[in-house]
A protein has these predicted regions:
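Iron-sulfur-associated redox domains of electron-transfer enzymes in respiratory
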Residues: 1-155
Length: 155
């Protein structure tokens, strides 16, 4: 089998997913930092954007991430009850249940949005989470918007 035939037979092998992670500064970002300083291996194709709290993340940023070329989006913050701002993660949990319905309405498969809790001490969990999401998004294939002209290149 020639190389082009092999690539056509295994299209998912050539796909390197682009993932945007919208994370809490106090917990998940610190967990990502711990994963890095501990030299834990995780997929390099994630772009981390940190926020003071997941409760402060505007749902439109998820749509903007997909419009900007993301194949998957992770929203991650402090475990329930551990929020630096007392109730921000509870607010986020309620909000993201609604965002999933918004994604379905706009034609985006809600399985491309991931929500997780990662504390500052869970570097291994962060690395495993990123690897798991990367594998799932790779299996799902690249995100194809309804209007491809609106998708900007990933830079």
């Amino acid at each position: 089998m020639t190389e082009p035939e092999r690539q056509l037979a295994e299209p998912s092998a050539a796909i390197e997913p682009r993932i945007v992670a919208l994370v809490c500064t106090w917990c998940t970002y610190a967990g990502a930092d711990l994963a890095g300083t501990s030299r834990l291996a995780y997929a390099p194709n994630v772009r981390i954007i940190r926020f003071p709290c997941t409760g402060r993340i505007d749902p439109l940023l998820v749509l903007k991430a997909f419009e900007g070329g993301a194949d998957g989006v992770l929203v991650s913050g402090c475990h329930p009850g551990d929020c630096h701002y007392t109730s921000g993660n509870y607010h986020a949990r309620r909000r993201w249940a609604i965002v999933r319905r918004l994604l379905e309405f706009t034609g985006i498969d809600s399985r491309r949005l991931y929500f997780s809790w990662v504390s500052a001490a869970e570097g291994r969990k962060f690395a495993d989470l990123i690897n798991e999401i990367t594998a799932k998004v790779r299996a799902a294939g690249p995100f194809e918007p309804a209007n491809p002209a609106r998708r900007r290149p990933w830079t």
